[in-house]
């Protein structure tokens, strides 16, 4: 009996010690609130630029999404991102009879939350048409309302009038085929596009890589998320598609300038895609080569980033996990290549 009583008393004491007592009736456990934990994405800067991460294709209940706009900001903060764009459909709003507000309302709600959490929020929208036009995001817009037009050409003209940054979305959707249509090619020739998604949702569009390189636009990787982000990608750092940006400053203007200058990398599912010069600088900042005993051909590589790398040394493949060091032996010179870093469809 004494042992049982002692156990009960110790348990009660532990409970009180672990809790913040509001009064004799209510104990609070704020430390169990997972909302206040941010999964930091530690990525190195490169010379002259600050490295930021973002998602530039996101939906809310104001179009066909499942969550309120401020929830998108909460998700981005928890996932370690720095910037998001709210890009609800202009033409497709199935919740329109239940949700009040004009086409700028989702941005206003998200931007207010962004100020509280330190997340940059970009005003945007998605021009939603069937092929051959396709889906197109207009970012950094002034007003979404006049973007809703009868003809897609009118919407593109309005985007130009508002000095928007324009992105071609999921170019292989919905028919699993990507080839520029005549109208898309004309818009590229007129310099109306600034970026192309090479990753969207759970898909990659490898043929887009060469077009991005040819046209000199930005590589983008975005979630196009509609449901809660954890429902699609799980919980943890580096799981969702994200665009890596090399910015002159940590501001909306800095993000815009980086996209317009095509200083971006696309990342998803352990794979990086981007311009060779940027990818080289970034990889060199992530990985450090150490000779352990060159006479015996023993070396090590340390990965100080939150991203994984796959190193091919001859015929051997080494996984370099985030924040880890690997050792390997190379007694004679061998060709070396990062298996998960691409500068084109078939170029590593």
Model-derived features with residue positions:
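Hydrophobic alpha-helical segments
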Residues: 16-17, 71, 96, 102, ...
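Ser/Thr-centric signal marking residues that sit
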Residues: 7, 60, 87-91, 223, ...
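Hydrophobic h-region of N-terminal signal peptides that target proteins for export
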Residues: 9-18
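A metal-dependent hydrolase metal-coordination microenvironment
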Residues: 28-165, 169, 178, 198-199, ...
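Conserved catalytic scaffold of divalent metal-dependent phosphoesterases
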Residues: 171-173
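Charged catalytic cores and adjacent phosphate/nucleic-acid-binding surfaces used
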Residues: 2, 20-54, 73, 131-141, ...
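Sec-dependent signal peptide recognition
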Residues: 2-9
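Alpha-helical transmembrane segments and their juxtamembrane interfaces
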Residues: 12-13, 67, 98, 234
